[in-house]
């Protein structure tokens, strides 16, 4: 049976949590999110939160973004951002560091939608094929995105047409990245 994006994301989240616990003997810790409410929070301690990914009861709705930009988002994009709450997770792709972007709370989801919309508007203005970012890299202008037309996971230079396919789809990409704790 073919794995879904939701399953692949849950699998990576568990691999990340296990790697963190193996190294630090506790759930993943985050100081930056300590004052923000989230269903991910398991415990607060020493100005930080211990957290774990939390599945959404219902898939998040992207209709407002799709209507605003008059574009249907690829199902993989909606599943990637709409299936769970989580802190961002550090990982590597073929030894290259990245930060997998996630949604911490409903308030964070609103900010994400605004950022996706701004990204798509900029791409339309520059006459670039639409993509939605899923990970940040160490290079300020390079992001890892899902191509809205093909579902390919790509490394792209923001504001340009420079793109490199990393994986056929997000399920393959998530299976091949390694948790970096």
From Swiss-Prot:
Cellular component, GO annotation: cytoplasmic side of plasma membrane
Keyword field: Cell inner membrane, Cell membrane, Membrane
Coarse class of the protein's main subcellular location: membrane
Compartments, as annotated in UniProt: Cell inner membrane
InterPro entries, alphabetized: Syd (IPR009948), Syd_sf (IPR038228)
KW Isomerase (keyword) present: no
Membrane topology of the entry: Peripheral membrane protein
Presence of the UniProt keyword Ribosomal protein in the record: no
Function: Interacts with the SecY protein in vivo. May bind preferentially to an uncomplexed state of SecY, thus functioning either as a chelating agent for excess SecY in the cell or as a regulatory factor that negatively controls the translocase function.
Family recorded in the similarity comment: Belongs to the Syd family.
Protein's name in the database: Protein Syd
Source organism of the structure: Vibrio parahaemolyticus serotype O3:K6 (strain RIMD 2210633)
